[in-house]
Amino acid sequence: MTTRSILGLIYMVQGLKQLGEDPEPVLRQHGLSMDTLDPTTRIERAREMRIYADWAEHLHDPLVGLKMGSFFGLAGYGPLVMLLMTCSTAYEALQTGIRYQRLTYLFGTLRLEPGERLSALVLDPMVMPHKAFRFRVDGEVSGTYKMVRDMQATMGLNLRAEGLDMPYPRPPEAAAYEEHFGCPVRFGEHEARFWLRNEHLQLKLPTFDPNAHAMYRTMCDQQLKAQETTNDTLAERVLTHLGMFNNHFPSAEDVAKSFDMSERSLRRQLSEDGRSFRDLLADARYAKARYLLKNTALPIEDIAAQIGYAESAAFIHAFRRWAGATPREFRER
């Protein structure tokens, strides 16, 4: 399973507290506490995703994700920032950032789409539950923007995007986005896109240093190797991913996209492990149902809805097949 620095989670906790939210109940639910988080340790990517999804369900301010970017400082990116700043041009810095994007705090995937006059830095977001999706997209877009602006300030530059696309419907708070990013923002697109002028990409960076660049590249390569720490099967990773969702679970195609593979490859590899996507979806629903029955007082019909059943009768039938007992009998044991 992929791991990464726990600093991103710590920054999120600090930001949520300063913005008037209370992240501690969700941390406790996951066996964590801000007082005991060690900034030198690492966290499993899937576990961190689950924490963000749980936070999103309890947020009071719909603009929290947008505001979170300001809590991510350059120092938290370690040698990656110096690797980017020692590139020869802005274009090379973008390409290098894309190559080493696993050293950032992103869950989505970055790529660069060249154009005749404008090019786009594209963030393809990871599929997540509805509330978590906007929370994470806003945080990742604003965090990327903050990182680039901070680097520019260090180098004495002041370049801005020509426009920004966001991958969800226009919210009531849309005006806050144009004010935050200082450019037109278009909603309802498939991916997030920063539109950049090509002449800006050819700009020579005043901090270019090939010798230092080689040193920082070696350090970043070592960090990438440290991320792969365990040998969890694909089935285990898919099951963990499905555990993030309530009400509407993602399709096999959506899950495959989250793991950067085709649906066909996903199904084939699961089959080689003796599992199927359908079985894993049932396992995820069963695990969530057990947890809700034992740890909450939610009515049966509400639990049925949370695990994707429109009618409680269908849920009761499925649960009896899984557990050999009805939900009520299981809860009373």
Language-model regions: role of each:
Residues 52, 94, 141-144, 220:
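Hydrophobic alpha-helical core bundles mediating ligand binding, dimerization, or RNAP-core interactions
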Residues 171-333:
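Extended mid-to-C-terminal alpha-helical interaction segments
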Residues 109, 113-202:
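DNA-contacting interfaces and partner/effector-binding or oligomerization modules
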Residues 93, 140-143, 212, 234:
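Internal, well-ordered alpha-helical segments in soluble enzyme and binding-protein domains
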Residues 18, 43, 132, 136, ...:
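Short, contiguous, pocket-lining structural segments
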Residues 1-121:
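N-terminal low-complexity or simple alpha-helical regulatory segments
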Residues 78-84, 126-130, 202, 224:
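Short hinge/gating elements
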